[in-house]
Amino acid sequence: MNETYDWLEQFSDLSMDNLATSGWTEDEAVSAWGEAQPSEPASFDSVKRKAKPILLRKPKKKKQTKRKKRKATPFFERPVIAVDTEYVESECGTYNRILSYQFAVLFEGKLSTIILFPESTKKSGRLALDKCLVQAIEKAMEDEVLDKWPTDIILCAHWLSADLFNFSQAFDQLKTHVKGLRKTVASLDDVYGLELDKVMSRRIDKEPLNVHDKSRNRHTLYITFYDTMLLSPNGSSLASVGELLKIPKVEIPEPYSISRMDEFLEAEPEKFAEYAITDSIISARHFERVSSFCQNTLSLNSVPFTIGGIAVKAFVNSLEDKRGYRGLFGFEKVTKEVWPSDRTKPLTITRDVPVTARMTLENFATQCYHGGRNESFIAGPTDIDTWRDYDVPSCYSAITLGLRELDYDQMYMTKDLKELFGDKCALAWVEFKFPEHTRFPSLAVRSEYGLIFPLSGETHCTGHELEVAYNQGAEITIKQAFVVPWKNDVRIFEPFMKWGRERRKSFVKGSFDEKLTKEMLNSCYGKLAQSLRPKNSFDIQAGYSKQLSPSTLTNPFFAAYTTGLARALLGEMLHNIPDDKVVVSVTTDGFLTNAELHEIDLKGPICQRFRELYHRIDPTGGEVLELKHQAKQLIGAKTRAQYTVIESEGFEPILAKGSVKVDPMVTDQSAYMVNKYLTRKPGDKVDGSYLTPNRMRFLEHKDLMLEKRSIYQNMEFDQKRQLLNPVMVDVKGRSHIALETKPHKSLDEMLFTRLRFDRWRKSHVLKDFDDWCSWQDRLVMAESTSHKNVRLKADETSDSLMARLFLRFYAHEHGGLSKKQVAAKELAEWMSDIGYPTKATAVRSAKQSILIEGAVPMTELTINLARLIVSKFPDFEVEILFNPESRSSLREALNAR
């Protein structure tokens, strides 16, 4: 990890310009004696003397007056101002027409609201943020919510990015004050100001916002921006937050809608104002609730910008050593002396840097970090049965209880496989091969399509996963392996998790505080892996994308341990499901199956390891697997795409849409997805509209709009496993193909299949037996010709390929064929008669093509054509056309009839 000291320049005025000195120059020395007259010698008396500067002395520098540090208003004593805007898309579709700006000022529980209307809905008629804030604050003072002008305020909105830049000149005034965060906007520092501009490489001083009230008195505002969407559980909508806070969002009456708000304003201005102001009230009350939670429940000094940030702060507060906690994550403090040009003595700075031993293995640990296991094990509908959706309770939260401080200096290499087993931080690079009958291999291989789980290959993984693979009978060869021992048995996250569990129990289930605490606990482990894999975000100030920086908790060893144990746990559970039971899919920490809970063996070593961790935070906790949902019939389309066909009474439908957007007005979205799947056709398109990205908005000064587009619908299987055993299943009166799967032999096999399936599905869908035969025919053709010098034609079938190659053998008189047997015209007529339209010119021109042997796959189509050819040309060695592996089977098929 590279540590820089650029921060120093921001706060010390240190720059290369300060190193230049201004002294007495040579030209000044000459001019100091005056100018000699060229016409006659000059005497000393005639010389006009000038004051001579003191030699070898620099002019005195003006003493810089240090700006006094401003005493800020304590965070929880600042007024909260929530902003919301209502707008509709312009007729030309290039900008938003702003209809109104509404503000809610909240201070010490008292509330003041105001709605402001622009003179025009054109861009030129937009109101400026500073003018709006003045009116909102003055209205709050009139309403006796504020008794004086504030200096520090909190400005918030639900989805701040959508509202903040609807003000006049917002891009020029605000782009250096805020930064993109999870595709929205939050403050870049504690207050509204400017920081070091990375593009111009120069310092920009922080500047507050200066405003004038109606009496022309000047006031200075220091603003901290918050996006309350980043502080809502699961990024909930404003309506959902309103329900949690018991502030219902005003419904838009028919026939109006969110896209016809201008008509709503014109027809019912009072109802429009109520609707608009309520949105700002919900946002203000939401921030008030989060603020109270941070102050009273977590004892924080301020409100972090995201729930993940709240989790980190709460976690640090749960530790005994709050100042040196980064030592638990493999950091040490390093001091360095620097000497700024404007100081009379050196300055000592301290930074946290990774310890040397951690850096030695950091890249290896990062390679061992992967995400969750996500696979579909079927393609198509299930039979009618009882299909259960099981989840591992508090999966990642419980696993973090296994994390202890690592003794990086004592890490060691090993070639002993069993040395990697057990509750250790063990990392390995291995080659593996599972037995052929293995249903669910447990070692992940990374690909451009995500993680796949083949029967053989090589991968970086953890000791937990190797333990499961070994118990499945896999042959494992260690290429490199390391064990990093625990320094002690103190569980880093245990106090935090126990505290969070107790807090959740103290709140009403389903309440705002309970949901917020739950997400806070679940988001903490995600910080362990932040920025381990390159991920860019658009930097608003710099104007380009740059890699997301690590969090203070980022640690590749902990991230690998946590996700590796989760994958191992799911792998062991899947392996212990009886062979006569079907598994539909697995998603991160749960799976869909028709097996009952008592039929799944949960006594394996990994299950026991997780059980011990889970019961550390909940000693009275139940089993390590629990039922969440249930259905009678499902469709498993692909990874993360499962739809409920027939529901089970008392359960919500199981639905994962697999990136397909459904109009929110559709009430039964599961039924919609089922119908969409059953009626799909090649070339179908779905809505692929997206919101204007930050890059486009800030570089082109565009409004946040819905960029409309259509994309090709993709509901086909993702080929992460090999399809087999097709049957037709009835689904709501329609028949649809259903397929089982088995693991691919290798990553290469999966990539080979996926590439060709993606090409095939451009003009096909997999819905019935004809589709299945078409796809299988195309796949075996690709396999047979992959190392041959032959190019497949579009929509060419295996028998058409065989006919094309057969003509070459005739033209070259090879394999027992002779032109004396039959003329080209006669052969063309015969080929046409048996169903392969051929011209005599094609027969003759086949001489120009090279002979290719062993390129024809064995299919029903090619066997039938082989019989016809042999009956016409008994001396022809038809086997020469087929790949060598299938020739014995071909002879059996030809002799069987």
Language model: regions and residue ranges:
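A short acidic-Thr-Gly-centered motif at the start of a beta-strand
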Residues: 57-79, 144-148, 214-216, 366-388, ...
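Acidic, Mg2+-coordinating catalytic module of metal-dependent nucleases/exonucleases
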Residues: 231, 237-341, 570, 589
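Catalytic palm active-site di-aspartate
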Residues: 279, 389-394, 521, 580-596
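C-terminal, non-catalytic extensions of nucleic-acid polymerases
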Residues: 291-379, 438, 463-467, 477-576, ...
